[in-house]
Regions:
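Glycine-rich anion/phosphate-binding loop at the beta-strand->alpha-helix junction
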Residues: 238
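Enzymes and membrane/adaptor proteins characterized by extended Gly/Ser/Thr/Asp/Glu-rich
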Residues: 63-192, 214, 219-235
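Short coil/turn connectors at secondary-structure junctions
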Residues: 47-48, 102-105, 206-208
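Metal-dependent enolase-superfamily TIM-barrel catalytic cores that perform enediolate-based chemistry
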Residues: 195-198, 202-206, 212
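N-terminal, intrinsically disordered, polar/charged segments of Gram-positive cell-envelope systems
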Residues: 2-36
Length: 238
């Protein structure tokens, strides 16, 4: 007799290649870059990065690396009588010092609110006329005019090397007698909040950093540059 042997069909099992990990997203790559950069800094360098200071009268370039500064704020004395090329070169010299020191670009800020506080457009070499106050811009064409004015500021400041405008003023004032009134939107809290939100969004779109001021709010208080203010408003009103 013949024995028949039944066999299971052969199965060809190939080793499977392990799945490649997913490519990191741009956000993940950026986060890792930040972590690596942070890990490379000394404690002293990390502390220096917390300081966003006024440009000193002397040693402005060397101070960037001496103190590992996070940023410089330019005031009227730093922009007065300078041509655009001269100001660009000055700001670039600060950035060059930061690049050699920590490799982290500086925040370069200025107060260019429009109206009474115009550290850049007050110099006729940098702009033919001063930027208008928020109230004047609004009176000339509503929020459309305000946002057009914001864009023009952002483009001018960016071209000169600034990346932060210490603006907009978020204080609420409806009384022309208030110290802060001329620098504010001049309307109630709801209208001011809407104005601030739209301006900040426009600045972000233009790549310009914004700073809301003044905390916790001037209201109708006196000028704290020259004295001490005591706010007498009840908490509910505040």
């Amino acid at each position: 007799p013949t024995e028949e042997t039944s066999q299971e069909p052969l199965v060809d099992i190939q080793p499977q290649e392990p799945e490649a990990p997913p490519e990191p997203t741009p956000e993940e790559l950026a986060a890792q870059e930040v972590e690596d950069l942070l890990a490379s800094l000394t404690l002293e360098e990390k502390v220096g990065q917390l300081f966003f200071v006024r440009v000193p009268d002397t040693d402005a370039v060397s101070d960037v690396s001496t103190y590992h500064l996070g940023g410089y704020i330019l005031f009227g004395r730093d922009t007065a009588d300078k041509t655009a090329d001269a100001l660009i070169q000055t700001i670039q010299s600060y950035q060059d010092a930061a690049a050699v020191d920590t490799g982290i670009p500086l925040l370069i800020g200025v107060d260019e609110e429009g109206g009474t506080v115009v550290r850049v457009s007050s110099n006729p070499h940098l702009r033919a006329s001063k930027f208008p106050s928020p109230q004047k811009a609004y009176a000339s064409g509503g929020m459309e005019a305000v946002l057009a004015d914001t864009r023009e500021k952002d483009f001018l400041l960016s071209a000169l090397g600034f990346n932060v405008n210490l603006s907009p003023v978020a204080d609420v004032s409806t009384n022309p007698a208030d110290f802060m009134y001329d620098r504010t939107f001049g309307q109630d809290a709801a209208a001011t909040a809407d104005y601030v939100a739209q301006v900040v969004s426009q600045m972000a779109e233009d790549g310009m950093g914004s700073v809301l001021k003044h905390f916790p709010g001037y209201g109708n208080n006196v000028d704290t540059h020259t004295g001490i203010a005591v706010d007498q408003r009840p908490l509910e009103s505040f």
